[in-house]
Amino acid sequence: MAYVLTETAAGYALLKASDKKIYKSSSLIEDLNTVEKVTEQFKIHRFEKFSSAANALEEANAIIEGRISDNLKKMLEDVKNDKKATLIVSEAKLGNAINKLGLNFSVVSDAASLDLHRAIKEFLPELLPGLDDSALKQMSLGLAHSMGRHKLKFSADKVDTMIVQAIALLDDLDKELNTYAMRCKEWYGWHFPELAKMITDSVAYARIILTMGIRSNAADTDLSEILPEEAEEQVKSAAEVSMGTEITDIDLENIKALAEQIVDFAAYREQLSNYLSSRMKAIAPNLTALVGELVGARLIAHSGSLTSLAKAPASTIQILGAEKALFRALKTKHDTPKYGLLYHASLVGQASGKNKGKIARVLAAKAAVALRYDSLAEDRDDSGDFGLSVRTKVESRLSALEGRDLRTTAKVIREQPKVDITEARAYNADADAPMADADSDDESETEEEPKKEKKDKKEKKDKKEKKDKKDKKRKREEDDEEEEEDSKKSKKEKKEKKEKKDKKEKKDKKEKKKEKK
């Protein structure tokens, strides 16, 4: 008898086929295109209902992984009693798992069985009593959502989309701040041109405008909160002899409005930078410890997500961000770039020009390991100790290349007990005793003996190596001589064969001439 195992969102259905060889007949399977034919061919033998949505999720995951659950095993015990029974399943992995149970029936899972399952699932509500189409759809939708959540294992702390958006906004803010600061300096420069030369910081420049207003107020304005004492005196003295033109109150209001925008943008940028730093430490702590928050965030944003970056090899991470230069180099057959976004990492910046490529390669290899630890490790440590330990290795490599100590990271020691500082014991000189001369002689002899033994061993080893070299050389010479002799013989034989052939040809020609005459 043929049985068909069908998995539904409601439970396991075991259908009994009226034709025991239906899975062998392609014409019969093709005819299963109406409700009447399907219900005529298959009857429900047993239906094992899932107890809850959680149970349905467990059973579905077991089937995907090719495992046999207790419910399914219990259900298959009924078929075991039917001798010469055939069980048709849709999944080959599931079929192999059922075969391992050692039940008294054969399991079939091939292309024809897939067509059979497709026909059954199309008219499944008609085959299962007590289940209508809408209820089955609702169960399927709920199970699909549960499986989706189970596979994704969603966690708000691990959403790398926040990093991608934050670093993009940070770059936009930097551009806006630079543009606004340039406009502000050009605008206020007509009134107080000397201020831009003395104050290079854009935020401090904007705060001075908001506090002081026109330059004539400089003498009565307290700028100690913004500038150090020396810089404050320079600004006040420059304001008295400034060559700038006068501006109206309306001009000053508009300049102050722009200065307020600069100060607000700078404050928001700082807050966004802190937010990005905290998100990077939560999502990729080891990458952050290795390359820094900004470089790490740019790498994640460039690849799209932390997972896709973790799956990339070290060679890809090394040149990430230099794609244009790479393809240009490949097209023109020039040298490919040695680094991309990693160029801005502090470790690469510390290296000299000739060593930047080497350090970028080492850093990319370590970053690939740190990324996989952050993204794919089951039981990971969010403290970033692994990243710090890897960074020390890169720093030691950099120090070796540069020829000077460039290590800045303290060595990471895990789970070490606190150090108890105790007073060191003083040296007791009274406990010293003079040693006899005989003892010293014995000690010198015992020290000389191992040295002599080492020397003898080294001499023996050197002699053996020399002998081996001589033997190899002699053997090589003999082989060369044999090869020369063989080549001479082969040449001689070829020459003799050629001469014989020429003589024979001449003889044949003479005989032909005689015959013609």
Curated annotation (Swiss-Prot):
Annotated region described as Disordered, given as residue ranges: 423-517
InterPro entries xref list: Nop56/Nop58, NOP58/56_N, Nop_C, Nop_dom, Nop_dom_sf, NOSIC
GO function terms (MF aspect): snoRNA binding; snRNA binding
Compositional bias ranges of the Acidic residues kind: 438-448
Keywords tagged on the record: Coiled coil, Nucleus, Ribonucleoprotein, Ribosome biogenesis, rRNA processing
GO cellular component, one term: small-subunit processome
PANTHER family: NUCLEOLAR PROTEIN 5 NUCLEOLAR PROTEIN NOP5 NOP58, NUCLEOLAR PROTEIN 58
Family: Belongs to the NOP5/NOP56 family.
Record-given protein name: Nucleolar protein 58
